[in-house]
């Protein structure tokens, strides 16, 4: 198992003007500066509005976010919103595009946002592209693997070669928003040029976050199997980040 040293910055500060930062590489200290601060710019006490995504669209100067699940008239709901800076203040606007059921992670794609749509008990999820301006038209990019519906697509990243990499755990089933899984929990790569969709890595409990290194030679995938969709936590299961070189295409050789 790999190990890494880290530094803790501002461990005692808990106010909105201070923050605690775990620094695994000294280069990050240059980004933080001598007196790093965390500032609360928006807050919503009615529901957990800022849970996933966090996609900045430079053309509109807006950040797109997705909420965690909450109840609306007794039914589970996830809200898509966009944050825009107005002078020294920030405003949040709820947006309800068609065709993005239970949105979760997202990434910049083309001129807009590529959402992970987890799906519903009766409709499949997948990857859905949304234009960033009204009327927020959407287009399904993927919604199945070899004819079988995805479990509940969770997070996504786009490589500079145009390929789309994403994770597909079973959280939707455990949270009772998706039917019983038809596929294992794996990492996929979709070649947008050829249409080829393949499994890049398996053996995960619940593959979750995914990201590339700046040079794109490495991909990082978190496995959050310890956190059950029903809220229970099992410390005997994986709470791990895996790393794999992308140079071993078409498959990944992951390590901790």
Predicted segment positions?
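Sequence-structural signature of mature extracellular/luminal beta-sheet repeat domains
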Residues: 1-256
């Amino acid at each position: 198992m790999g190990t890494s040293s880290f530094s803790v910055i501002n461990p005692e500060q808990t106010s909105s003007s201070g923050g605690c930062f775990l620094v695994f590489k000294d280069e990050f200290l240059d980004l933080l500066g001598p007196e790093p601060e965390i500032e609360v710019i928006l807050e919503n006490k009615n529901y957990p509005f800022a849970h996933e995504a966090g996609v900045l669209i430079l053309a509109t100067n807006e950040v797109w976010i997705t909420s965690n699940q909450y109840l609306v008239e007794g039914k589970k709901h996830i809200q898509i919103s966009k944050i825009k800076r107005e002078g020294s203040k920030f405003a949040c606007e709820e947006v309800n595009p068609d065709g993005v059921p239970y949105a979760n992670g997202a990434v910049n794609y083309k001129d807009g946002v590529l959402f992970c749509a987890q799906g519903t008990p009766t409709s499949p999820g997948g990857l859905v592209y949304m234009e960033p301006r009204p009327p927020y038209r959407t287009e399904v990019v993927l919604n199945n693997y070899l004819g079988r519906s995805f479990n509940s697509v969770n997070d996504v990243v786009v490589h500079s070669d145009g390929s789309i990499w994403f994770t597909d755990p079973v959280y939707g089933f455990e949270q009772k928003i998706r039917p019983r899984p038809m596929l294992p929990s794996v990492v996929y790569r979709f070649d947008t040029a050829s249409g080829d969709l393949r499994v890049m890595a398996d053996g995960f409990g619940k593959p979750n976050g995914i990201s590339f290194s700046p040079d794109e030679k490495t991909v990082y995938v978190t496995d959050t199997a310890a956190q059950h969709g029903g809220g229970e936590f099992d410390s005997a299961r994986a709470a791990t980040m895996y790393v794999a070189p992308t140079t071993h295409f078409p498959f990944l050789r992951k390590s901790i």
